[in-house]
């Protein structure tokens, strides 16, 4: 083998090694320590005695943890309901969101009092175009109005239970994975719910920095 061939072979080997390292670093994900996720920090809460008997239920286990934690920290059922609703907007985007509407039925158990209904579900447009159909007054205002009348905890504090789920991330469950597979073609490929060319899967961690910023603005400036 002459010197030219040796040099050529050496260059090819170096290029191959460099490409291999680049491929490794580009395809190897930075692993997230799931024990540090906010949802796991609040999972093992202990009842403080602020409320002797209570129950929180929702479509999402993480949102339910948020509601439990709010009550454990001294909030009432309305506070927990608002926290759960906002947590669902983070963890259940296929069914919940800040642009939606809704209705809430509240009852505090006082003698002679009838349940109260808060409705915030009128739509801004009946001619649907992607992104232009939102609730008026909508979810955010509806939650705020309900909390003003029925809540106990400082509303800004409630947001602090939810924002870390968007900012630091949450673990995808099987239901979200299934929904994303069905509706993935309608989602922007640059969204946090895509990893490369495929939607995220159960066990992946999703961070939503823009949503976290929006929640902070609502917390600090109001609806």
Predicted regions and their residues:
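Activation on terminal intrinsically disordered regulatory regions flanking enzyme cores
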Residues: 15-18, 32-34
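Surface-exposed charged/polar residues within alpha-helices that form helix-capping/stabilizing sites
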Residues: 68-69
